[in-house]
Design a protein with these regions (language model features):
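Extended, histidine- and acidic-residue-enriched regions that form the cofactor-binding/catalytic faces
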Residues: 1-98, 104-237, 253-255
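Alpha-helix boundary/capping motif
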Residues: 236-251
């Protein structure tokens, strides 16, 4: 998951992908690095189809809602924001004007703020709509509300892309907690003893494959809007054009 490109291969890159994961509990059957693995998998499959380059991932982020579980490690939102802004600035200095944050963790709310402030130089992917479309394309039986964490979607993606990382037990680990109105204040603990919120028993490699294919296909629209933002910014001073809303402000698909 660490890119091995040479400096020469990077010369003509205009768009970079920064996978942003987490290091947090995912129940007894998925690894702490699940969100990072998913973000990297999405980014790598995108890079096979579009003219972009994948950066090394951010592996620790904002997982404070999981603080009660062993192994979970977090950084502050301010630190994550600073890392993203520093990476974007460094890329611009190297001639790469655009950065897409490929997030595998829904708790990284600050990524949306970084994108909002970037004046069209960043995008956040996947957004809520892309995740929901991926669920539909894959025939997921669990809704996005119910399938919050270590459920059908995440387990399916790992069963497809990295089955060696899925330990036995997911078939009997279903747990639903749709009413999570105090999650930000109280964290995950009041809603699950195992760390799972969802129905991993319904996961399959085929669903993971189809979900990823949907996400890769959807990225083309996000890339086109990001490029259009750049054109609007270059022309705006002369023609009064406005930036195009690409929906980056929407919430992410999981936790």
């Amino acid at each position: 998951m660490v890119p091995m490109h040479t400096s020469t291969e990077e010369r003509d890159v205009r768009v970079a992908l920064l996978p942003v994961g987490s290091f947090e509990q995912h129940g007894p059957f998925l690894p702490l690095a699940t969100d990072t693995v998913i973000a990297c998998t999405v980014a790598e499959e995108i890079a096979e189809r579009y003219p972009v380059r994948v950066l090394p991932p951010v592996t620790i982020s904002c997982s404070h809602e999981h603080a009660g579980w062993p192994g979970t490690v977090s950084i502050s939102a301010a630190t994550l924001y600073a890392v993203v802004r520093d990476v974007a600035e460094s890329l611009r200095g190297a001639g790469v004007p655009k950065l897409v944050l490929v997030s595998g963790h829904g708790g990284n709310y600050v990524l949306g703020n970084a994108v909002q402030e970037s004046a069209g130089a960043m995008a956040l992917f996947p957004g809520m709509d892309e995740w929901e479309d991926a669920r539909t394309a894959a025939g997921m039986a669990t809704s996005g509300i119910s399938d919050m964490h270590a459920g059908e979607l995440e387990t399916s993606i790992l069963l497809h892309a990295h089955p060696e990382l899925v330990r036995p037990g997911y078939e009997g680990s279903d747990h639903l907690a749709d009413d999570r109105r105090h999650l930000l204040t109280a964290g995950m603990a009041p809603y699950t003893a195992s760390g799972v919120i969802g129905r991993p028993s319904l996961a399959s490699a085929g669903k993971g494959r189809d979900a990823l294919a949907s996400l890769v296909g959807a990225f083309g629209n996000r890339l086109a809007v990001l490029d259009q933002q750049g054109q609007a910014a270059r022309q705006g001073g002369h023609e009064g054009q406005h930036a195009v809303d690409d929906g980056d402000g929407e919430a992410l698909g999981g936790a």
